[in-house]
């Protein structure tokens, strides 16, 4: 299971809307395994396929703690059925926006219908951290990032910072 390179802001692919997975076959199974390996290696709790440059409606999650047994979820073609009115605030980060964290307010609970890695239609009701992670990753599938919930000033500052990093990286690579 090879790890896949992560797509980093300001890459425009992160703003694309992902397409549904048509068939769950061995290629999709392998993609799920690669995504999980990539997520665990990067020490993340979630990863959407678009974050490795694949615009498919697919994500992986594991909110278990380091001292707990792994409990990975593979979620294909998710559809949010309902969101609670009650809200939570969590400090969020993103593998596509490394080393940046900000508080984001989201619904505390939700219900999602999806296909699991075997293609079986499933529903999950989640709250707190799992609900937040599901919403964060589903946002990726719709071309939305957690920084979109911040003020325009903060969001623009983050994007400028990452554009500058990308420019410096490209300059260094050109020198080598």
Swiss-Prot record:
Binds 1 Fe(2+) ion. Keywords: Hydrolase, Iron, Metal-binding, Protein biosynthesis. Pfam families: Pep_deformylase. Its cofactor is Fe(2+). The active site is at residue 137. InterPro entries: Peptide_deformylase, Peptide_deformylase_sf. One of its GO terms (molecular function) is peptide deformylase activity. GO terms for biological process: co-translational protein modification; translation. It catalyses: N-terminal N-formyl-L-methionyl-[peptide] + H2O = N-terminal L-methionyl-[peptide] + formate. Fe cation binds at residues 94, 136, 140. Transmembrane segments: none annotated. Its EC number is 3.5.1.88. Belongs to the polypeptide deformylase family. Removes the formyl group from the N-terminal Met of newly synthesized proteins. Requires at least a dipeptide for an efficient rate of reaction. N-terminal L-methionine is a prerequisite for activity but the enzyme has broad specificity at other positions. HAMAP family: Pep_deformylase. This is Peptide deformylase. It comes from Bartonella henselae (strain ATCC 49882 / DSM 28221 / CCUG 30454 / Houston 1). The gene is def.
